[in-house]
Swiss-Prot record:
GO terms for cellular component: cytosol. Its EC number is 2.2.1.7. This is 1-deoxy-D-xylulose-5-phosphate synthase. It catalyses: D-glyceraldehyde 3-phosphate + pyruvate + H(+) = 1-deoxy-D-xylulose 5-phosphate + CO2. Mg(2+) binds at residues 135, 164. CDD domains: TPP_DXS (cd02007), TPP_PYR_DXS_TK_like (cd07033). The gene is dxs.
Length: 599
């Protein structure tokens, strides 16, 4: 959609149409709502000032990029948002040439912009990378690694900082507003450049006084950090005022050096029910637009809620129980613990590396730390797991939420890899509950275990409820749940036990069922015994095949045939969990058919 010739009034009208379209679709499909509604004018102004055909548009996380999709030939397709086979909830180059880069995880955008700027410079092209990044992403160290190089090399990159939670200092009255306007003007930029040149030629004493005056002036604006890094700062400005945004972006584009534009926006803008309620409306399922009430009522407790309640009870009884989350207090279930035990449970922001490492000394000092984290985000702290936890062999427990297929968030969020990347780490112990009660036992085991460990559980509810009697975890011990006379053994791990059990219902042959419980260390004694009784083993685990559960079993070199139904070597697409599982051939009826082809 070419909006270059639109008037301000037409752009404002377009922004409202975009908001309405977003609200209409997200209320049906679910998705990221509040930040998306708040970023509409920012994205409209980006498309007005920059050339999406040639300038790299880079969205951090990109969950707020729905307006960008609507402006780039996906208005009609938008009905399929986050649906299987439809458009992604994040930027995706395979979906559109206007999506410069894949995104989904936080704080990568400025590094990408630096890389793009280097390529543009080497090719001697007239293009400008433009970044949209939220204030929450500014808590991650990678941002400052990128800013450090950007400020040194002075590549022309325009960064729009979308401050939608007031986490960066608020503007200080009329003076700050005045400075924000003046700092964006060509006059101010020219005077600043001349002043810098003048300072170089002043005597040392005069330079000192002048610099002190300059720093005093900076202190009344929030931009001193960026200025010290060598990046020009403009703002704060109103992120919903299209006239101001367009004027500011136009100036920034012409500056030919790195600049950060600090724009303040309101989350949920245009939908009164969501305005100001930051976390609740961040990511939502289908809801009634008129009331804001959710349309999906879960009948089973989620694994997250079970973990949260159990950890809360343990923390109430034992003051040595502590925990951390990286910007996901609600998603991981730590929110009530942070609220009631604020001196022992922390949200450190989008800082997975710091979250992991900071728990190590607590374990050494006699506390029992839990790192509550999504499978996909633990990847961001992997070196710290090895270097700072496993190498020290301290009792940090990793509660890995969203293990397996998570659904509509797609490739960047599926929890497929944790078994594969944690299993090779010396001193690490891996186990998984199969149902709500064994999840409670998993938390208890982790609390009392004094070495590094990790347990995984799914998004939403378990497949199993209470079909089998639950027993506490014992280190390295598996459990034979169903014993039959046949020579077929189903080996389940975590939620895979439920998948195996449901598959058994579609098979007439006698089948035995083993809950592996621990994938590291394995119950070698029991597995060796079972290898004498069962010739064919079928592995069920919501994890990657490469380096996964079946790989661990194969390493034992048992005299059995092993077939695994773990995830193949691919990135798993977005869509409702049941639709994705069907596409992968993982529904019970499909699995039963595959099993029958072997036995």
């Amino acid at each position: 959609m070419n909006i270059k010739n639109y008037t301000i009034e037409e752009l404002e009208e377009l922004s409202q149409k975009i908001r309405q379209r977003i609200l209409e679709v997200v209320s049906k499909n679910g998705g990221h709502l509040s930040s998306t509604l708040g970023a509409v004018e920012l994205i409209v102004s980006m498309h007005y000032v920059f050339d999406v055909e040639k300038d790299p548009f880079i969205f951090d996380v990109s969950h707020q990029a729905y307006a960008h999709k609507l402006l780039t030939d996906r208005w009609e397709q938008f009905d399929t948002l986050r649906q299987f086979g439809g458009i992604s909830g994040y930027t995706k180059p395979k979906e559109s040439p206007y999506d410069y880069w894949v995104a989904g995880h936080s704080s990568t955008s400025i590094s990408l912009a630096v890389g793009a700027a280097k390529a543009i410079a080497l090719k001697n092209e007239d293009r400008v990378p433009v970044v949209l990044i939220g204030d929450g992403a500014m808590s991650a160290g990678m941002v400052y690694e990128a800013l450090n190089e950007l400020g040194d090399r002075k590549y022309p990159v325009v960064i729009i900082l979308n401050d939608n939670e007031m986490s960066i200092a608020k503007p200080i009255g009329a003076v700050s507003k005045y400075l924000s306007q003046k700092m964006a003007s060509p006059f101010y930029q020219n005077m600043k450049k001349r002043t810098e040149q003048l300072l170089k030629h002043l005597p040392e004493s005069a330079t000192y006084i002048a610099k002190r005056m300059e720093e005093s002036l900076k202190l009344i604006t929030p931009g001193i950090l960026f200025e010290e890094l060598g990046i020009d700062y403009i703002g704060p400005i109103d992120g919903h005022d299209l006239k101001v945004l367009i004027e500011t972006l136009t100036i920034a584009k012409q500056m030919n050096r790195p600049v950060i534009i600090h724009a303040q926006t309101l989350k949920g803008k245009g939908y009164k029910i969501a305005e100001g309620y930051y976390e609740h409306w961040h990511g939502v399922g289908p809801f009634d637009i008129s009331t804001g009430e959710s349309l999906k009522k879960s009948t089973k407790p989620s694994a997250t809620s079970i973990f949260s309640k159990k950890l809360y009870d343990l923390a109430k009884e034992d003051e040595t129980v502590v925990g951390v989350t990286a910007a996901m207090p609600s998603g991981t279930g730590l929110k009530p613990l942070i609220e009631d035990f604020g001196d022992r449970f922390w949200d450190v922001g989008i800082a997975e590396q710091h979250a992991v490492t900071s728990m190590g000394p607590l374990a050494k000092e006699g506390f029992k730390p839990f790192v509550a984290i999504y499978s996909t985000f633990l990847q961001r702290g992997y070196d710290q797991v090895i270097h700072d936890i496993a190498l020290m062999d301290v009792g940090v427990a990793f509660a890995i939420d969203r293990a397996g297929i998570v659904g509509e968030d797609g490739e960047t969020h599926q929890g497929a890899f944790d078994v594969s990347y944690l299993r090779p780490i010396p001193n690490m112990h891996l186990f998984a509950p199969r149902d709500p009660k064994t999840l409670e036992y998993a938390v208890e085991f982790a609390k009392d275990f004094d070495r590094p460990c990790a347990f995984r559980y799914p998004r939403g509810s378990f497949i199993l409820d209470d079909e089998f009697e639950a027993k506490p975890f014992e280190l390295g011990k598996a459990e034979l749940l169903v014993e039959s006379e046949g020579d077929v053994l189903f080996v389940g791990y975590g939620n895979g036990v439920g998948r195996a059990y449901e598959t058994m219902k579609h098979i007439d042959e006698p089948v035995s069922l083993l809950d592996l419980r621990f994938v590291k260390p394995l119950d070698v004694e029991l597995l060796q015994e079972l290898s004498k009784r069962y010739r064919q083993w079928f592995v069920f685990s919501d994890s990657a095949k490469l380096g996964g559960v079946a790989s661990a079993l194969l390493e034992l070199e048992l005299p059995v045939e092993i077939v695994t139904f773990e995830y193949e070597d691919q990135f798993i697409p977005h869509g409702k969990v049941i639709d994705v599982e069907k596409a992968l051939g993982l529904l019970p009826q499909q699995l039963a058919k595959r099993v029958k082809s072997f036995i």
